[in-house]
Structures are given as structure tokens and as C-alpha cells.
């Protein structure tokens, strides 16, 4: 019997994309597609028909509108319909093509070949039901920050271990290994993210002893790391900051994104309280990435 899914479509301002992603993920949506249409984004998420009712979907619409309007954005539009599993599993792939990021990386869908003249490091990716295709500003900011932290232009990179907290599809952890890190931890509270990360590691020829994947959060990082990357929403970053001294070496670096511009000061203040010094803030549209260094244990 063919399983049927609710296809939930949200049209909103591009700046509200991450908020909608987070709400869809919290609701239980397992796959997403994003299209840009005349300055607005169309985001589609999918959830099994038997898991939710029409009343649940109506409530989701209310939550999304509250989230988006509270940040000062225009009211989003919500539409839903029933589709067969095979239909949604393949339809969104048509909208995703190889994407160059930074100076050295190319994100390439697993079902496509990179350009013949490509000279970049290729990250093969099939996000499946997890979040993270590399198209969003916050992901690209994190990838560019990883390029900076793992740069080997002037001297070889010493053995480096990183942790990707909230790994989604595993794109950031995988990129760090391709850029020269020796080992990476990838953790996420979603079992779908764990599965997607493991699959993407195989696609990129990464061994299980290079990429340690666990379901959970920071507590699953079993050694002190040289750097940590967190591309998650600001409230979650603030929640886990007090725990990071347990896993980050003194003078270790941190890349923090998923942060709206008007949230940056609040996150920066919490970083300072937890013993981090802020090096730079990178901005792209309404999103930013904070690059920091861990200086001391908090008082």
C-alpha cells in the first residue's frame, strides 16, 4: 500500500525561512524543499497522513504565523494537500543543483555530477528527510567560517577535532573533514539527522572512525575538541553555551549561526558570560554568523 503524506507549503519572506524550517521540523516534517519566488520563499514540508489531523495542521499554521509576525515579517501563507510518497520524494530534487560556496567548496546533490571543469572540494549530499542542503545563508556562512578556521595556505593544519552540534544532514562536519580536520563529531537530537549524516559520510568516502555520529547533543562529544560549530537557532545556542566548556579546549574556536541580526547582541553577551571572546560577526541578509574563541572558564 502506498503511503500518503501531507504536503505542507508555506510562502513567506526569505528572512523568515529559518523560523519556518524550525517550526516544520518541530511539527515532525521529514523532508523539505525551498524555492525562491519573487523575493519570497516557498517552503514545503512532508508528514505522514496518519500522524496528524487537519486540526493539527491548522494549529501549525497559527504557530508559524505567530513566529513570523513576532519577528516583524509579513504574514506567511499556508497550503496543504495529500500526495503519494514517491511524488514528494523526487519532485523537490528538480530544484537543487551544484552550489559553489566560499573559495574551496562545491555542494553537489548525490544524483548529479559536478561540472567537468570543477576544481573545488566536492561535498556530495543527499539530505533525505533531514534538514540541510547548503542553500541557506546560515549554512553557507558556517562553511565559509570553516574554510577560514581550517585554512592551510601558509602552514599545515595540526591534528584538529571538531564538533558539529545540531548536524542536520551532516554537511558542516563532512566539510570540516574534507577541508583537513582529522576527526569530527556530528550530533543531533533527530534520528533522521543521524541517518542522513551517516549516509552522506558514505557518499563522501568518510570512514566511521573519522566522523563520529550520535543522537543527542553536546554530551555525546566524548573528548575535548579544537572547534565547535552550531548552526541552530539563537535560543538553542544560548541554552547549550554553559555546557560547551566541558567539550572545548582552551583557545578553541566556535562558529555560531542560525542567528537573526536582531538576536546577535543577545548571543554575543551570552558568549562573553561563558568565557568566549567574539572575533567577528559575518552578515548575510537578515542572518549572521559569530566567530568566537574560548578564553576561559566562566566565573
Swiss-Prot record:
Main localization of the protein described in the UniProt heading: cytoplasm
One GO location term (cellular component): cytoplasm
Coiled-coil region: none
EC number: 2.1.1.-
Reactions mediated catalytically: L-lysyl-[protein] + 3 S-adenosyl-L-methionine = N(6),N(6),N(6)-trimethyl-L-lysyl-[protein] + 3 S-adenosyl-L-homocysteine + 3 H(+)
Keywords: Cytoplasm, Methyltransferase, S-adenosyl-L-methionine, Transferase
GO molecular function, one term: protein-lysine N-methyltransferase activity
CDD domains: AdoMet_MTases (cd02440)
SUPFAM superfamilies, per database record: S-adenosyl-L-methionine-dependent methyltransferases (SSF53335)
Record flagged with keyword S-adenosyl-L-methionine: yes
A Pfam family this chain is assigned to: PrmA
GO biological process: methylation
Subcellular location: Cytoplasm
Binding site for S-adenosyl-L-methionine: 139, 166, 188, 231
Keyword Methyltransferase: yes
Functional summary from the UniProt entry: Methylates ribosomal protein L11.
Family, as annotated: Belongs to the methyltransferase superfamily. PrmA family.
HAMAP family: Methyltr_PrmA
Protein name: Ribosomal protein L11 methyltransferase
Organism, as annotated: Thermosynechococcus vestitus (strain NIES-2133 / IAM M-273 / BP-1)
Name of the coding gene: prmA
